[in-house]
Amino acid sequence: MTAQNRFRDTEIRASRGTKLTAKSWMTEAPLRMLMNNLDPEVAENPKELVVYGGIGRAARNWECYDKIVESLTHLNDDETLLIQSGKPVGVFKTHSNAPRVLIANSNLVPHWANWEHFNELDVKGLAMYGQMTAGSWIYIGSQGIVQGTYETFVEAGRQHFGGSLKGRWVLTAGLGGMGGAQPLAATLAGACSLNIECQQSRIDFRLKTRYVDEQATDFDDALARIKKYTSAGKAVSIALCGNAAEILPELVRRGVRPDMVTDQTSAHDPLNGYLPKGWSWEEYRRRAQSEPVLVVNAAKTSMAEHVEAMLAFHHMGIPTFDYGNNIRQMAQDMGVTHAFDFPGFVPAYIRPLFCRGVGPFRWAALSGDAEDIYKTDAKVKELIPDDEHLHHWLDMARERISFQGLPARICWVGLGQRAKLGLAFNEMVRTGELSAPIVIGRDHLDSGSVASPNRETEAMQDGSDAVSDWPLLNALLNTASGATWVSLHHGGGVGMGFSQHSGMVVVCDGSDDAAERIARVLHNDPATGVMRHADAGYDIAINCAQEQGLNLPMIAATQGRKA
């Protein structure tokens, strides 16, 4: 098998309503979510199976996609489909409470876990980059990261600006599937933003979906707009078509002072995701095929200049942070020895949430009916009545976020809350309040499901940044708990060799059996995050574990000795 069958001039959309294509909702759900990942409203390049994040794909090639669809259509509720890097490799008899699909994407033996070896396998058709939610079939468009980015900006505002970002502006780059969330997140947090993107098509997509408000005609126009809006205290997002490796150094030379600096280009993948300065996108794609080593070097050289500019802002005292694309590592590889002087966003702003199992809980309406999402929004408010911040997020999301593909919602909630919400949603399906089942999943970027020393597990207080037993245990436990599909990936977010991570999705079809699975999965999944952080010695996590009654033998022993 080769990688050649990766283009098909077609459009895919998931079925809507209650008519089944597969044999049950347990198999209809992964089928619809696979197709939803490739909906033109959702995916970055669906005709080549690319969902987001450089070359993050939903299936290895179109032949594999067709066989996955065929397998899911005929799969029984006591069988499990195995997916190996986007290729359906087996169907096995299991049982009704086992996952219907088990997915392993992009995993390599550590010595060979690098882009060079992966790209060789990719060209031969032996591997597929699954990113995080591309190959695990639970991507919901840019909304999937909006709240996490919003929470980051809000916390940065608390730490650096007295709790308000009014009249402030964020400098960043990248308007792809993940980076496209930044302008809207900044606006929702009360800040202006200047968002640099080298592909006009991506700017057009974000303008169309209302994730970005305006496009500047050129560099000077962008700065003039920023000055106008910040002076008026307005939160407006501005896109600028250009190369960050050229624009950020120029801003430094001019003495321009943003209030916050970050980046979400696809720097994790220098061959496919970061345009070298001075190159056109067409040249970049052409030479990636004929001169991959030269292209990687050129991209990383530009990243080094990009990071040098970020360091200059950092040394000016401007809050500057990596937003999880591994650009600091790429720059360090090119000789920028102090690349890690500015922090990643997780240790800087998010880790206290992870210690309580709080993370990106998401759900999608298989009916295709937006009213089902609005009803679940109301249920979240009803069941979590005192969280004004969460209510504000849900109100803003309804007002500002356009659904992409099947209607979906994300909100950050933690241990105890997730199971409560899942069971309530299942009951809403049972009573007919929702018109069809829903699926509940999450990003792999979560409390207990990832090992990524340059992102989610950066600067762990016990030094366990690179220990990847935790996402493996998370995947095993979600499988044992009865998630509908479970995934285990390598390289998402930060690229080959730098992360391992797992995901899960559970279906709410209104049945008693589903309720039992939901209760197990949506408790155990965030509980592994509390466990992981408690094991690392975080007091917030230890206290949460005690409050939630988690049985963590070594934590109990440690606390007993302290007493």
From Swiss-Prot:
Catalytic activity entry = 4-imidazolone-5-propanoate = trans-urocanate + H2O
Q: Name one GO cellular component term.
A: cytoplasm
- GO aspect biological process, one term: L-histidine catabolic process to glutamate and formamide
Any single GO molecular-function term of the entry would be: urocanate hydratase activity
> Mostly located where?
cytoplasm
- Fetch the SUPFAM superfamilies from UniProt: Urocanase
- Stated EC number for the protein is 4.2.1.49
Alphabetically ordered keywords of this record: Cytoplasm, Histidine metabolism, Lyase, NAD
Q: Which PROSITE patterns match?
A: UROCANASE
Determine if Cytoplasm is one of this entry's keywords.
Answer: yes
Listed pathway(s): Amino-acid degradation; L-histidine degradation into L-glutamate; N-formimidoyl-L-glutamate from L-histidine: step 2/3
Question: Where along the chain is NAD(+) bound?
Answer: 53-54, 131, 177-179, 197, 202, 243-244, 264-268, 274-275, 323, 493
Per the entry, the cofactor note is: Binds 1 NAD(+) per subunit.
Places the protein is found: Cytoplasm
Q: Does the keyword Cytoplasm apply?
A: yes
Going by the record, the broad EC class of this enzyme is lyase
Which Pfam families does the protein's record reference? Urocanase (PF01175), Urocanase_C (PF17392), Urocanase_N (PF17391)
Q: Where is the active site?
A: C411
Q: Which cofactor does it need?
A: NAD(+)
The entry's family comment says: Belongs to the urocanase family.
**What is its biological role?**
Catalyzes the conversion of urocanate to 4-imidazolone-5-propionate.
Q: What name goes with this protein?
A: Urocanate hydratase
Task: Give the species.
Answer: Yersinia enterocolitica serotype O:8 / biotype 1B (strain NCTC 13174 / 8081)
Q: Which gene encodes it?
A: hutU
